[in-house]
Every structure is written in C-alpha cells, then in structure tokens.
C-alpha cells in the first residue's frame, strides 16, 4: 500500500498535511498530500509502492502533533455496491495476514458520523469474512496489526492496517472520557486526556500518584486543579480569580492570589507543573523554560494557544526555541512531546519531562 491515512481534527488538515510532508521527507519517503478543508483527514500518497509500510513502522504516531491516528491505506474504494460491500474490501486487504482486530471508522465530522450506525452493524459480517479470508485471526490479539476500514462517505472507504505498537488504542484515535459532574470546567478533560496521552498506563501509578505536590498556574476556576486533586495530589493553585469552593473544601488546595507569571514556589519538592493560560504561546513557553532552568518541577503539562495562520510552523518554532534555551542553560536531559488533543481546540498540549531516566527524590 502506498497511501498513509491520517485522522485529525476538522479544520486542521493543513497543519497535519504540512507535518506529514516534512516528517515523511525526513525518512526519505517521497510523496504528496491530498487534503480538503474540514474533511478531518489527510492522505499522504507515497511515490513508491509499499512505502506507507515504512511510515507506519518507523514514524512514531506519538511524535506527530496533529495526527490522532494513522494507517497504511489502499487507494480509495469507490462505488461499493450496496448488495455486496464486503467482497471488494476483503479483496483490498488480501495482503494483510493474521491481524488481531478490525475497526470500521469514519472521520470526525458530523457528515461522516452519520454513518456510525451503519459502521457498527457492518463490522460484524465484515469481521466474519476477514476471518475466513485469513486477514483476521479467529480471536482478537492486541499484539497483532489492526485492520482499519474508514468510510469517508456512503460506498466510499479507505482500507488498510496499522501496527499495534505504533497506533492509538482508541477508535478513530479519540479517547472516550466522561465529564465529571463536579468538575469546575470542561477544560478539566484536557488534562485528563493529557495524562493518558503522555504517561503510559504502566507508569501512571509511579508518576501520577497520591501525595505528590503540584502547581497549577492560571488555575481559576480549577478545571486542571480538579484532575490533580482527584488523583490525591496537594496543589498550589495560582490565579487572581476565584477558585471552585468544593475544590477548596478538600483541604488539598492552597490558593495563591497572584499572577502566574510572577509566582515562585516556596517549596522545591514539586513534581507536576500544569498551566492552561490564555496567553501568547511564546510567553507561556518562556515561563515554563524559566521553571525548568530553576529546577522547580519534574514533569510539566501546558497548553500553547495557536495563532490563526502558520500554526504548525509557529508551534515547531516555539518547541525548537525551548529546547535550545534549555540546553544553553544547562538543562540537557529532558523529553518533550506535543499533541493536538481531542479536547484541545485552537491550542496544543505540551509535555516536558526533566531527567526522565533519573528517579524522583
């Protein structure tokens, strides 16, 4: 297969396209992008047959900012007959052997999601035929490749596969998170999703645990503080505005009525720093850089608001500058990740982990 199919948020196709064009080029996989505004997906068509396999193997999904999920894909199947949509799909997947799972999906648009009920019903007979053809194992296996069938419209679908060790565990790349009734704001879901995105499940007990100290800059009314509190942390919430009363009643939050850009922590045993302020992204990045250089945290999660234009270019420039400044100031052991999360809109979420190979004291 020579196509790479990438799911993204509707309206961010240009950013996703610019990113995959650059990243594929770094792996010497030539090709061109096919993308339309508000389709919520991008197709990167490689010049060489089977080159998409190189990308799904060697390009880490977690290293892509704007792609939620990706898979090596066939050419678009069109005019699938209502009487038998399955046969052309099974034929297009003939080179896929012993996959462990099949997902019948759509792009994340209102128009495409109208096909969701059909996709659920269609999955059952398709699964049976794929088992008969040998493309799918009789029993689900999380270690085997995943078959993707993505309907972009009635009778029109891309089909292909991803590798389970380089794929989102979520259907369409979207985590299904529930808004807690007592959360102070919907922004709470951003940090909830970020923890799942940036901290592997098997490490969460160690890195996101009860009793830790955390700081939330720009905390009001407490959406992100809520996620820290529910995980048993003690939080210094910094904001001139009021905090949610129920959060304050937990006894786990100390409210500092200060400007987040001027606040300095009294204690130096802070593990988590979080920040979701409506500010220019470069200014927020400079703030996090200062905290990192001072060694005031171990891990940070923060949001960068995106400009209206050149969003991919702006984000990559800020991240590159951040890494340069940290290194120039003696901070050389760190890991940076960035993702346009499902619960993000005109922003991206960044994770900065200082001394990732050194235990927290």
UniProtKB/Swiss-Prot annotation:
GO annotation (BP), single: methylation
Similarity-based family: Belongs to the class I-like SAM-binding methyltransferase superfamily. RNA methyltransferase RlmE family. RlmM subfamily.
Annotated active site: 305
Keywords attached to this entry: Cytoplasm, Methyltransferase, rRNA processing, S-adenosyl-L-methionine, Transferase
Primary location: cytoplasm
Pfam families: FtsJ, RlmM_FDX, RLMM_N
Subunit architecture: Monomer.
Organism the protein comes from: Shewanella putrefaciens (strain CN-32 / ATCC BAA-453)
Catalytic activities: cytidine(2498) in 23S rRNA + S-adenosyl-L-methionine = 2'-O-methylcytidine(2498) in 23S rRNA + S-adenosyl-L-homocysteine + H(+)
E.C. designation(s): 2.1.1.186
UniProt cross-references to HAMAP family, sorted A to Z: 23SrRNA_methyltr_M
Amino acids binding S-adenosyl-L-methionine: 187, 220-223, 239, 259, 276
Gene for this chain: rlmM
Protein name per its UniProtKB record: Ribosomal RNA large subunit methyltransferase M
Any one cellular-component term (Gene Ontology): cytoplasm
GO molecular function terms listed in the Swiss-Prot or TrEMBL record: S-adenosylmethionine-dependent methyltransferase activity
Localization, UniProt: Cytoplasm
Job description of the protein: Catalyzes the 2'-O-methylation at nucleotide C2498 in 23S rRNA.
């Amino acid at each position: 297969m020579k196509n790479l199919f990438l799911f993204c948020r509707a309206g961010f196709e240009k950013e996703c396209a610019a990113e995959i064009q650059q990243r594929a080029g770094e792996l010497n996989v030539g090709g061109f992008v096919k993308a339309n505004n508000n389709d919520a997906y991008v197709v990167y068509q490689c010049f060489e047959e089977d080159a998409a396999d190189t990308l799904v193997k060697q390009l880490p999904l977690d290293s892509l900012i704007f792609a939620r999920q990706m898979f090596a894909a066939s050419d678009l199947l069109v005019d699938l007959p209502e009487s038998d949509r399955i046969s052309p799909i099974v034929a297009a997947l003939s080179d896929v052997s012993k996959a462990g799972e099949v997902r019948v999906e759509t792009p994340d648009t209102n128009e495409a999601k109208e096909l969701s009920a059909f996709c659920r019903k269609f999955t059952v007979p398709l699964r049976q035929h794929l088992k008969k053809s040998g493309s799918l194992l009789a029993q689900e296996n999380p270690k085997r490749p995943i078959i993707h069938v993505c309907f972009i419209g009635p009778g029109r679908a891309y089909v292909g596969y991803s590798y389970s060790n380089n794929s989102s565990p979520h259907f369409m790349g979207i985590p299904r998170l529930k808004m807690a009734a007592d959360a102070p704001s919907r922004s709470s879901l951003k940090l909830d999703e970020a923890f799942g995105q940036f901290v592997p499940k098997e490490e969460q007990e160690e890195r996101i645990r009860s009793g830790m100290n955390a700081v939330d800059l720009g905390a009001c009314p407490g959406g992100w503080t809520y996620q820290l509190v529910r995980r048993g942390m003690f939080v210094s919430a910094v904001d001139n505005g009021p905090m949610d009363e129920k959060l304050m009643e937990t006894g786990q939050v100390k409210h500092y009525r200060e400007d987040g850009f001027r606040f300095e922590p009294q204690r130096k045993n802070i593990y988590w720093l979080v920040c979701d302020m409506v500010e220019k992204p470069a200014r927020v990045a400079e703030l996090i850089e200062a905290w990192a250089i001072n060694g005031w945290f171990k891990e940070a999660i923060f949001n960068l608001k995106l400009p209206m234009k050149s969003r991919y270019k702006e984000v990559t420039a800020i991240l590159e500058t951040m890494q340069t400044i940290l290194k120039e100031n003696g901070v050389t052991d760190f890991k940076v990740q960035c993702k346009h999360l499902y619960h993000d809109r005109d922003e991206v979420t960044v994770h900065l982990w200082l001394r990732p190979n050194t235990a927290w004291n």
